[in-house]
């Protein structure tokens, strides 16, 4: 997890640009990031979603703002969603997003979430019930295949 990243391999140039862009969130954790995340694919919470959308499997490159997905934050992604509801009404649809103010994750079914949790934790699996999520949403810019999760 590195604030402001979206699935690209974190090299020195990208890290330096993120330190300049986010001096507190990235610069304040520079040593940890260099020791743990340098030369690995990194993403923040919404970057995990954007990175998959922007990834071009043919070229194996991340193309910013491609496939109709703009460069927006977690709260704007929630605001832009046309299909959403309170977390207690979440349908069992794989790939829905779960949201709380300032943070977003991906529902993978059966009460489980994948989320980019924080710089020192990274990307984790978590329990839907334990995350403090307030709402679910269909991620704008993604077409869903309505298939229910299986055990």
Residue ranges, per PLM feature:
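N-terminal capping segments
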Residues: 1-61, 101-103, 114-116
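Aromatic- and glycine-rich peptidoglycan recognition patches
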Residues: 40, 58-91, 101-151
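Loop/turn positions that initiate beta-strands
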Residues: 93-96
């Amino acid at each position: 997890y590195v604030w402001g990243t979206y699935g690209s391999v974190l090299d020195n140039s990208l890290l330096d640009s993120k330190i300049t862009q986010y001096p507190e969130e990235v610069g304040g954790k520079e040593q940890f990031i260099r020791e743990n995340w340098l030369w690995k694919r990194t993403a923040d919470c919404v970057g995990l979603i954007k990175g998959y959308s922007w990834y071009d499997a043919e070229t194996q490159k991340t193309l910013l703002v491609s496939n109709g997905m703009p460069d927006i934050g977690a709260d704007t992604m929630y605001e832009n969603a046309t299909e959403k509801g309170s977390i207690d009404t979440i349908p069992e649809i794989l790939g829905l997003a779960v949201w709380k103010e300032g943070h977003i994750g991906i529902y993978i079914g059966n009460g489980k979430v994948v989320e980019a949790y924080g710089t020192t934790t990274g990307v984790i699996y978590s329990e839907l019930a334990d995350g403090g999520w307030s709402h679910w949403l269909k991620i704008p810019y993604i077409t869903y295949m309505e298939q229910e999760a299986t055990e």
